[in-house]
């Protein structure tokens, strides 16, 4: 199958090009000049970009990762392609070991089925799991249930890792509670990303965590001590150390656009990662109330979700294609930085850049075609439309 457009994102620029896709292998077989062969699909001036990857998303359409329900997870994977997502990490919230173990086993089961037969679980590919908690600061817990926020426990984590079939790719933790940085070092040694978040760490403590193998920061600005010119905290460390990745929620509610612009100016085109941090409310009517981590949460008209009892911001319902639009149109971020933030950089973060994240021969045919308003015209997940 041959696709073509006059605006294909290749080698960090827009080019007129054809993409040859194998529907059998799900790979990009080659990229050629526009019009060089008869195209099966000609998208004219529509933008063609790599498939989006969301490495921090709790759920959507009424489902939450912690629910441990197969059908909910399948429905989620099938529907998030509507926003251009071709790969994602179902993300847990802090809870009891029993609840988390069931959730991890559920994701692992569905992911195994999808890997064995991609038609059995159509839609976006489950690329792993993001374990957000339980190793978080009680002070900066946000909407996470406080009673389950505990210090890092290496033996417990090993049980979680086994339950996940080795699918845990990212662990968010409060590094100030990681005695001797044992958990951080263990994660790094085993190819798992230690990401600082929901933490009261100082800039110096964050720097030591990076020196011990931490590689990322979870939703920069949120769930941590704020940046101050005398104590810049985790945000300051994320800005200073260029090789560290940083997530950011680009909905205009979690962070002001000037703060988003500052973040990407500091991180450049290679280390900023856009995430949705979406809750089960995505795709549901305004005013819906549901439990999140045992707490009652309500969906507001602006797309944000808040704890009913305290009004605390609990998460978002951001769609990744809308986040891309926000980066370009509202935050004023350059195209290369904006596109990389939802494609190549998340792939690099989780060590999948050899097969994901860019339009290149030999990589998976994860392709999104965007209209002028950034809505999705069509999508290919591993070559399947």
What name fits each language-model region?
Residues 46-48, 55, 65-124, 148-163, ...:
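Alpha-helical scaffold segments that flank or form the walls of functional sites
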Residues 58, 74-106, 123-137, 164-176, ...:
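Divalent metal-dependent hydrolysis catalytic cores, especially in the metallo-beta-lactamase
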Residues 78-89, 137-165, 208-220, 231-245, ...:
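Active-site gating loops and adjacent loop-to-helix segments of metal-dependent hydrolytic enzymes
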Residues 158, 162-286:
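Active-site core of metal-dependent hydrolases
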Residues 104-132, 139-203:
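Metal-dependent enolase-superfamily TIM-barrel catalytic cores that perform enediolate-based chemistry
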Residues 1-49:
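Histidine-rich, glycine-flanked metal-binding segment
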Residues 233-246, 264-276, 282-363, 367-370:
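His/Asp/Glu-enriched, well-ordered alpha-helical/loop segment
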Residues 6, 26, 45, 56, ...:
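Divalent metal-coordination and catalytic microenvironments
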